[in-house]
Amino acid sequence: MLFRSYAAPKSIPPETAKKRFNLALHGVREALQVNREQVFIKTRARQSGNEQYEKKANSGKFYVVSEPTANNQRAYFLVNFSDYLDTGLFLDHRSIRKIIAENSRGKTVLNLFAYTCTASVHAALGGAKAVTSVDLSQNYLDWGRRNFALNGLPDTSGYQFIAQDIFEWIKSNTEQYDVIFIDPPTFSNSKKFQGTFDVQRDHVPLINRAMNRLAPEGVLYFSNNFTKFVLDDEISQRYHVEPMTSQTIGFDFDIKRPIYQSWAIRHK
């Protein structure tokens, strides 16, 4: 079992936060009948200044999990519960992955901020003609290659894995794609990144550059987890924008404030 929590704000005394954490953990273990040694705990703290998320451990232990595909098959993924802040699979995005697969047959697909390429796997299993995955991290792209292999997807030129700054790559790329998926981080100050990335500040140039690579009849799926995010009016005025949040959030993530927001963006 993976038990995730967010670090309490400074206004909460540490003793109170610890007590609440232990009560919640005990309650979940009791309800699911899980032994303590079967529990993996991850705590996410607010990132600030020049702080960066580092690798947490070096167990190298991966588990195989699966989820339904658009054609009622199974997509298989490697997850790691101990070595990284995240596991390699974002459960809250499973509906978006399925939508991408449903719209990928015979098409060219571009996955930006691809992470471990789970959306790319769904696109490939959905019959995409070609899938390009771009991420700053070679490590995560290698993980993505393993996910492709796990699903029996051949290592061919039709599946590309590109480790590069997304802004730099998309500025120099001249290809057009039928389906584009962008799920950027809220904030990044990676040493490999040129400057910093802030999704609220930088989403307009990011989407505009991506739309330059979108085929005339194509669709760009844009999603992000910044709860206070507001899509700039420039995007709504320039393109046809369809809100998708209510369609893509599963019942187990259906809380008062959506855990993320998503849109389908097309040329007018």
Regions found by a protein language model. Give the residues of each.
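Mobile active-site "lid"/loop adjacent to the S-adenosyl-L-methionine
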Residues: 140, 163, 179-209
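Conserved SAM-binding loop of SAM-dependent methyltransferases across substrates and taxa
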Residues: 116-129
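C-terminal catalytic and target-recognition region of SAM-dependent MTase-like enzymes
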Residues: 205, 219-268
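S-adenosyl-L-methionine
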Residues: 136-181
